[in-house]
């Protein structure tokens, strides 16, 4: 009788285990795994503030996480060439022969580059492309130069030397900035745009008037921190860095003759006039006469491998970045929501992954 009770007890335990297993198997599958997937990325510092702002929301929605180490667009392109990370960002297209055949471009992040300055004036400065080009090319060296004064009537401009700060690393932000200078003021910025400021500089940085006055720093955080600690300085970077560094931001004259602030609406208006190619590249139209276009709007391209082992998670991340709730998660950062033909292109590119 004792053996029979033990046998019955064992059978009951077995039945309980089988029932529990069946109930677990019958549950509908979830889009989230217990641990999720941790994606890794690097590259453009332009992308960092948006990615930071969207990280928690993406995790809550997908169960996945990501880490992004920045390093600059050049570092992102190099990492992509070596097959490092799940995604890498570059603010200019990766057209070099080193790009792997399975890597595609997804222009997923849009925002303005701000021309930022540390100057003791109360009114926001207004600057045209030709004036900005003259400042960064070293032909305008004083804040009260007639070119600046003519655009800022009523502003008490000091007779101080302008200290120019540029990106010393390979930078897509620099590439876009110098493309803008060459595109809108080619007589002054005579060289084509370049990701390397030194090689794209239309003159010599070692002349007596430029040496020590035009200096470099690495990364967006580096140039804005240096500018923030240097009175009478000027630099260029993503808008999100201006406030932290205590910098003012100029309104820039567009091709229609209007001075436009670097905001999301102005960026969207400018990007809407760009030519979008099937390979994911944008060609900006600096001559667009859209009234509120901000002519220093740019995109950052996600460089992704279509054969990624984490294809599903990667697609979900890029889709989340393009969702309006991501660029508007912190409106003060100035990122623009991608819409229209560019959004359609992005969705097509994302569909190629996996």
PLM regions: where:
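Flexible loop/hinge segments at secondary-structure junctions
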Residues: 7-17, 21-354
């Amino acid at each position: 009788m004792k053996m029979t009770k033990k046998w019955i007890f064992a059978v009951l335990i077995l039945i309980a285990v089988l029932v529990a297993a069946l109930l677990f198997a019958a549950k509908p599958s979830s889009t989230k795994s217990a641990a999720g997937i941790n994606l890794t990325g690097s590259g453009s510092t332009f992308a960092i503030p948006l990615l930071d702002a969207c990280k928690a929301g993406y995790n809550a929605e997908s169960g996945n996480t990501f880490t992004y180490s920045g390093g600059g667009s050049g570092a992102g392109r190099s990492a992509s060439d070596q097959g490092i990370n799940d995604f890498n960002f570059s603010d200019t297209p990766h057209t070099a022969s080193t790009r792997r055949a399975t890597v595609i471009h997804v222009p997923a992040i849009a925002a303005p580059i701000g021309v930022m300055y540390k100057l003791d004036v109360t009114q926001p400065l207004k600057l045209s492309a030709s004036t900005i080009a003259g400042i960064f090319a070293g032909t305008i060296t004083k804040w009260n130069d007639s070119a600046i004064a003519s655009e800022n009537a009523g502003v008490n401009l000091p007779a101080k030397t302008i200290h120019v700060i540029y990106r010393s690393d390979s930078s897509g932000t620099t590439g876009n900035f110098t493309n803008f200078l060459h595109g809108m003021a080619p007589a002054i910025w005579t060289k084509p745009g370049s990701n390397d400021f030194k090689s794209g500089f239309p003159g010599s940085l070692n002349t007596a008037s430029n040496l020590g006055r035009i200096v470099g720093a690495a990364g967006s955080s580096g140039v804005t921190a240096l500018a923030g600690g240097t009175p009478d300085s000027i630099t260029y970077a993503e808008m999100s860095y201006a406030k932290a560094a205590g910098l003012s931001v100029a309104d820039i004259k567009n091709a229609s003759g209007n001075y436009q602030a670097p905001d999301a609406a102005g960026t969207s208006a400018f990007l809407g006039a760009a030519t979008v190619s099937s390979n994911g590249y944008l060609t900006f139209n600096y001559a667009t006469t859209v009234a509120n276009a901000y002519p220093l709007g740019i995109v950052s391209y996600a460089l992704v491998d279509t054969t990624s082992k984490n294809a599903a998670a990667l697609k979900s991340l890029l889709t989340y970045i393009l969702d309006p709730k991501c660029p508007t998660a912190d409106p003060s950062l100035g990122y623009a929501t991608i819409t229209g033909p560019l959004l359609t292109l992005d969705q097509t590119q994302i569909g190629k992954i996996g």
